[in-house]
């Protein structure tokens, strides 16, 4: 059974992480990647994630399963970056666990908004576009995840770090 779990939330611009030992958070943060294009950021990620790996002790990596992307080009860039990140984080005996976003979000009590909750947002902010309401619900769900992190004694402002904690 895994006792040292590294939760990660990766993107083409950063990796957020939370290291849990025996279900208790011990180290967390976010590393930003720099570069004028995805390939420069991949190289930066390779160096920074290698350094991060040297400072962390884990036996399992928990990564959010990619569900959908807006374009094929974005999906390819994410695949390149995730490959670079995972290649640096993995040891020979590292277990990898992929978790669907709705599964971990539900586990921490951050389920999708119900019709009633969505209607409450519309009632509170009348006259907005559907896109505005969708974005507002997304923001509120991000805040729920940040609030969950606070229940563990972690003060974070980055929803990326909060996602890694979740």
What is each stretch, according to the model?
Residues 1-166:
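Phosphate- and other anionic-substrate recognition elements at nucleic-acid/protein interfaces
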């Amino acid at each position: 059974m895994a006792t040292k779990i590294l939760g990660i939330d990766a993107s083409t611009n950063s990796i957020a992480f939370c290291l849990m030992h025996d279900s208790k958070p011990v180290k967390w943060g976010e590393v930003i990647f720099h570069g004028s294009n995805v390939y420069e950021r991949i190289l930066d990620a390779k160096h920074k994630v290698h350094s991060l790996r040297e400072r962390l002790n884990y036996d399992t990596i928990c990564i959010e399963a990619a569900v959908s992307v807006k374009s094929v080009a974005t999906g390819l860039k994410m695949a390149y970056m995730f490959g670079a990140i995972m290649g640096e984080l993995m040891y020979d005996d590292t277990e990898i666990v992929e978790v669907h976003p709705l599964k971990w979000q539900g586990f921490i009590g951050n389920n999708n908004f119900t019709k009633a909750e969505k209607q409450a947002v519309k009632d509170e902010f009348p006259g907005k576009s559907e896109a505005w309401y969708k974005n507002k619900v997304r923001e509120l769900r991000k805040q729920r995840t940040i609030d969950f992190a606070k229940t563990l004694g972690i003060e974070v402002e980055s929803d990326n770090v909060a996602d890694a904690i979740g």
